Amino acid sequence: MNQKLFSVRTGPLFLLAVLCCLLTFSSRLAGWDASTVHDRAGRDAFVGHHLTKTSPPPFAFIYGGKASTGVIGKWTVSSEERTEGPKLIRTVVYADPSTGLRVTAVYTIYKDFPAVEWVVRFKNTGRADSPIIEKVRACAVSFPGFPGTASASGPVMLYRARGSSAARSDFGPIDEPIAPKAEIRFGPVAGRSSDTNALPFFNVATSEGGVVAAIGWSGRWEAVVGRKGADPRSIDLTAGMAETRFKLLPGEEVRSPSIALLFWKSDDRMSGHNLFRRFVLAHHMPQTGGKPTPLPINHGVGFGGPFPCNEYVCATESYAIGMIERLHQFGIEPDACWIDAGWYENATGQWWSGVGTWTVNRKNFPRGLKPVTSAAKKLGQGFVVWFEPERVYEGTWLDREHKDWLTVLPGNANRLLDLGNPKALAWLTDHISNFIRDEGVTIYRQDFNFDPAPYWKAMDAPDRVGIAEMKHIEGLYKFWDALLDRNPGLLIDNCASGGRRIDLETTSRSIPLWRTDYQYYEPNGYQCHTYGLHFFLPASGTGNGDPRKYWFRSAMGGAVVMGWELTGSFNLQAAIEDVAEFRSLRAYLYGDYYPLTAYATGDDAW
C-alpha cells in the first residue's frame, strides 16, 4: 500500500481521509496490537550476537592494515551498564595495549521498543600517532535467517526515500527488491545528509517482518544492503561515513555516525514504518513535558518588496510590528512569527552578502529585534529568527576578524566556519546563545546553503581523511546541545536549503519547519513531499501562501509556515477557518500513517 493523506480536494473527502488516521491515533493502536508487531526476539538475538562484552561488535574498520574482526578480540575489553528510564545503556571499551587505541562503543537497548542504537568513539591514548584507521563502518552486521527469506514467499525489499533537491520528487519513496547475490548502495550526493539522492532512514522487509534502520550523521554517509553471501537467507547491512582513512594524534578522539535498528514482525510493512514513527516520537523528537513538542503555526512578518529587495533585506521594525498587529487585527493568531534571511548588517543587494556578520542591521531595526519579538510575545506568540552560521561570505565580520577559523577555496566567496575548531565553536555558541536570550528568540532557525564536502577535503591531509568532517559534525551537535541547554524551551528549526540535512542526530535535536526549497506554495508538490517523508518522520513543516482549502491542506505536516498578504482580495474567512482546522487536526498528524493510493508526481494524480 501507499499513502496520500491529503490527496483529495473536497472538504468531506479530505476529512474522511484524515479520520482514517484520527481513529487509529485516538485509540493508539486501533487496527493492530503493538505486542504482535514488536519483534523483541529478533532484537534480543541481535543484542546477544553483537552488543555484549564477549560478542563480535556490530561495527568494523581496518587498523594498521588489518581488519578489526581479526584483531579486536585480542584487545583488552571492559564493560559497564546503567539504566536511564526506558533505556539500558551498555558501554563496551576495546583497548589495544600495544598502540594505545581505545575504541568505545555505547549501546542503547530500549525497553519500550524493539530497538537498539549505538555510536563508536576512537581515542588515541598513546604518546605517538596511531596507525592508520580506515574504512570505518559504524554498522557492519548480517542477519542470518532473515524473517521471510526461508519460505521464499516473497522478495526481500528495501523501502527507502529520496532526499531533498528542491524538486517535486523530494522524499519520493523508492521500493527496490534485493535479489540473491546482489546489493544496493546509496547515500547523499555530497556533504549534507539528505541531499538529493537519499534519506538516511530505510526499511528492509519481507512478507513476515523486517528491520528499520536509521543513520545519525549530518555529513557524507553510505549504506549498503545486500544478499551477496553464500546463504541467500542472510541479509548484510553496512553503513558509515563515505570515506575514512586517518591517523589519530596523541590524545585525539573522534566519533562515528550513530546507528539505530528497530525490529518488527508483520505481513504489512507499514506496521514497521508506523512502529518506527512512534519510536521517533518517543525518543528522537524535541519533547515538552514528556511528550512531543507541538509544532508551531508560523507567519512571516516581512515580504521581499520591490527590486532590489529580496528575502527580509528590506524588512524594518515598524513593518514587522505592523504585520504582527495586522494579523491580530484580523483574527489570525499564529503560534510564532518569523523573520528570515536579511535582518543582519552588510546584507546589501543580496541577502547572502551579510552572512558572517551576526549583528542586527540598526538602520532597519534601530533597537535590535527585541521590540519586534516583544510585540509577538504580548500576543502569546513565539518568534523565529534565521541564521546560517557555518557559511561566511567574503568581507563580513568573521572573514575580516577571524580568518584562522575559516576554510577558503580558491575563487569561492563562501568560506566554511570550522566547527571543529574549539575557539570558533566557543565563540559561536556564546554569540548565538546570547543573541537568542537578548533578542527574545524562541525558535532558532539554522540554514546551510552550500556543500561543505570540498572544504573538508581541502582541510584533510592524505593520512587524515575524514577528520575535518568528523570534528565539524561533532561540533555542530555540541553547538545545538549547548543552545538547547542554555535556552530552556528553545526549538531548533533545521533547514539546510530546505530539508537537506535530515538524519537521526538532527531529528533528535530539531524539526525541519521548511522541509524543501521546492517552488514556494505549490500544493501538488507538497502532497508528494508529505507522502514520502511521512513513511519515516511524523513531524515536519512547509509553506502556504494561499488560504484556499486544497492549498492549505496540502501544506499540513505537523507545522505550517504562512506568507499571507492581507490585501483587498484576500479571503480572510478562509484563512481563519484554515488555522482553526489545522489546530483541531494537528495532533492526529502524529498518528499512524496508512497509504491510500499509489505514489505519483503528475498533476493528474492530485
Stretches found by the model and what they are:
Residues 294-433, 439-443, 452-455:
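Aromatic-lined carbohydrate-binding/catalytic grooves of carbohydrate-active enzymes
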Residues 246-265:
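Short Pro-Gly-centered flexible turn/kink motifs
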Residues 50-75, 200-219, 266-300, 330-341, ...:
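Glycine-rich, aromatic-flanked loop segments that form ligand/cofactor-binding clefts
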Residues 32, 476-606:
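Active-site-proximal substrate-binding groove within the catalytic cores of carbohydrate-active enzymes
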Residues 2-15:
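Bacterial N-terminal signal peptides that target proteins for export
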Residues 12-24:
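Bacterial N-terminal signal peptides
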Residues 31-228, 232, 242-244:
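Polysaccharide-binding surfaces and accessory modules of carbohydrate-active proteins
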Residues 120-122, 374-376, 423-504:
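Active-site and adjacent substrate-binding regions of carbohydrate-active enzymes
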